[in-house]
């Protein structure tokens, strides 16, 4: 029986962040009501200053830090785009 007070999510890392985090993807279980911001804090994901890292939640780029995570959510941390 699944824990009804928790959500299981998958995180995906791209670019240099994949090297910093030491993995391409991580699956985690968090307390119900956890947000994207909570996830960043818990795993110390480097988002300081103008890192340019964008967050996609379930395929939607630009997820706010106060977005409440749902069971089965997929959160991707995308490197800045470079034009040319």
Each predicted region: which residue ranges?
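Ubiquitin-like/PB1-type beta-grasp interaction modules and other compact soluble beta-rich domains
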Residues: 1-83
């Amino acid at each position: 029986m699944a824990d009804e007070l928790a959500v299981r999510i998958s995180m995906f890392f791209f670019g240099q962040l994949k090297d910093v985090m030491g993995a391409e993807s991580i699956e985690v279980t968090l307390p119900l009501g956890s947000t994207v911001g909570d996830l960043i804090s818990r795993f110390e994901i480097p988002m300081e200053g103008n890192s340019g890292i964008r967050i996609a939640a379930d395929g939607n780029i630009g997820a706010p830090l106060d977005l409440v995570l749902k069971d089965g959510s997929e959160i991707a941390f995308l490197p800045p785009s470079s034009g040319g």
